[in-house]
Amino acid sequence: MKLGAYYKGGDLKKPSGGKKRKVRRTKKKALGGGPPQIPKLGEEDVRIVERVRGGNIKVRLREAKYANVYIPKEKRYVKAKILSIVETPANPDFARRNYMVKGAVIRTEVGKAVITSQPGQDGIINAILIE
């Protein structure tokens, strides 16, 4: 009977008593791109260009001051200044922290609007006027 078979230690030892080593190093793709970078209301538009999986590039929005607001009655877009974030269905805390995500209701110079783009992914804020 082998005593190695009954050894119940940490995961760093093999049944034979030998040390376990890493199979491979931690690769960049396994880290998942880091923590989420949610755009905030700021004094000016701040964008970062980032390399993503496959060698592609993605323009991310860090801070925003303006939004492209679509006015359905007039069938045109207007570049409007964002005054505040009214509510965010994704997370109530986002509105308090001035985070802008898809579906958030923002107050602009032309009225209230709902964000239709993904600012953190697209690098721009598109919205539709609701008032």
Swiss-Prot record:
| Intrachain disulfide bonds | none
Write down the superkingdom of origin. Answer: Archaea
Q: Which GO terms describe its biological process?
A: translation
Q: Which InterPro entries match?
A: Ribosomal_eS8 (IPR001047), Ribosomal_eS8_CS (IPR018283), Ribosomal_protein_eS8_arc (IPR020919), Ribosomal_Se8/biogenesis_NSA2 (IPR022309)
**Segment Disordered: which positions?**
1-38
**Where are stretches of biased composition, namely Basic residues?**
16-30
Alphabetized, the UniProt keywords read: Ribonucleoprotein, Ribosomal protein
What Gene3D superfamilies does the annotation carry? Answer: 2.40.10.310
Q: Fetch the Pfam families from UniProt.
A: Ribosomal_S8e (PF01201)
Q: Which residues form a coiled coil?
A: none
Q: Name one GO cellular component term.
A: ribosome
Could you tell me one molecular function GO term of this UniProt entry? structural constituent of ribosome
What family does this belong to? Belongs to the eukaryotic ribosomal protein eS8 family.
This protein's assembly is summarised as: Part of the 30S ribosomal subunit.
- Read off the HAMAP family from this record: Ribosomal_eS8 (MF_00029)
Instruction: From the Swiss-Prot or TrEMBL record, give the protein name.
Output: Small ribosomal subunit protein eS8
